[in-house]
Amino acid sequence: KSQRFFGLNLFIMNQTYVRSLEALGALPVMVPLHMSEASLRGIFERLDGVFLPGGEDIDPTYYGEERHPLLGATDKERDRTELLLTRWAIEEGMPVLGVCRGVQMINVACGGSLFQDLHSEDPDLDKHDYFPPSYERYRISHQVDVEPDSRLAQAMGHKHEVNSMHHQGIDRVGYGLRVVARAEDGLPEALEAPALPFAVGVQWHPEELAKTDQMSTNLFYNFVYAAAGDWREQAPAGWREQFALGCRAVSRNGAVYATNGHHASSGVIGAPAEVPQCN
């Protein structure tokens, strides 16, 4: 992300992400913000995978909504940069792994939407915002149930205890994505794109658990393994065109809502404004 420090504009990255990837043989490259689309594309074409870390809230205009009073800080340039990288990666079938904000970015890039503040929009949900410094980043907060036929289950099994540091969540699920894990209150905790070699996002922070939790390490390993593999040959024929049409349809017409119990679980709902990147 970008940040001001003693009058300087800095790009910063949590070292835990870098160490988690480097330990498994990856060569992490931090992509600068504020770049032209052409320059950003030049960097993208040299990558083998895209990792999307946690961070600020995503500007709701990207999924056709007004700002909620409890929306947190946003970063316009980071939103723009990550949306471009994510959409390009999904179009190409390049492996993608998203953490916390990262899974939300994957969803928005595919035409989905977010709850801008979980507890004000649904008071019946459990607490998910165990933020530091009040809580340790590695604090186990709840369990997730993982779909047994998912890529995530291959890494983490069918049930897993996770940390939780978010006040937003997945609402309308984007095109080509499937909810593959839920918290005990029904809130989506992970998404993946079954048609692609590896496109997975989780709402928790596995990098904070990886030192003592082999299953969290497995998730990073599977991403690195996919990035080093022959993913360029695995994307389905016609996927780019299919994705563009599907993403546009979802963002215009609504789609399956993700949660159980408190919200609709199926059907076309509303007509949110078109996401700018779905074109």
Enumerate the language-model features and the residues they cover.
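Active-site-proximal beta-strand elements of phosphoester/diester hydrolases
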Residues: V200-Q203
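N-terminal beta1-alpha1 cap of cysteine-dependent amidohydrolase-like domains
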Residues: K1-L97, V108-F115, H119-M156, E161, ...
